[in-house]
Amino acid sequence: MDELNSFIGLARSYIDSDKLAELDKILATIQNDLFDLGADLCIPDRDKNPDSLKIVISYVKNLEKEIDALNGQLEALRSFILPGGTKISSYIHIARTIARRCEREMIELRQIEESEISKEAVQYINRLSDFLFVAARYVNLKLDFEDILWVPGNNYKE
């Protein structure tokens, strides 16, 4: 989680446009959420008291709301896209891949008998990676960079 949070912070450090002010606020909220997630993950459910931080469904719903808001401003995808564009977008794509790795590791840990990682925590990190994908595209749009489309077999045409 620390690596993921750090890359989000790195992406935010490059935001200097008013066009991305709202996204910066969302990313700041996510950075705080990731600390909450870390607190949730470090204490097994059986050892938590009622006041312990836990990722609950409202975290997931808030992310889904933000995904819908940003995605509503983007053109529908016609192809897969390649990570890139602006520095901010590129760092957000790196954060997205780290979120996917965290998700895989959390799922693996959930399968261990003694693990007590909540389904809400896994849902949150899953939705976060989706949010970061949409956010990277949103950054490129707002900063007038086009998505880089994947062209299957482009390098091997005769």
Regions found by a protein language model. Name each.
Residues M1-E158:
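Phosphate/pyrophosphate-binding loop motifs in nucleotide- or prenyl diphosphate-using proteins
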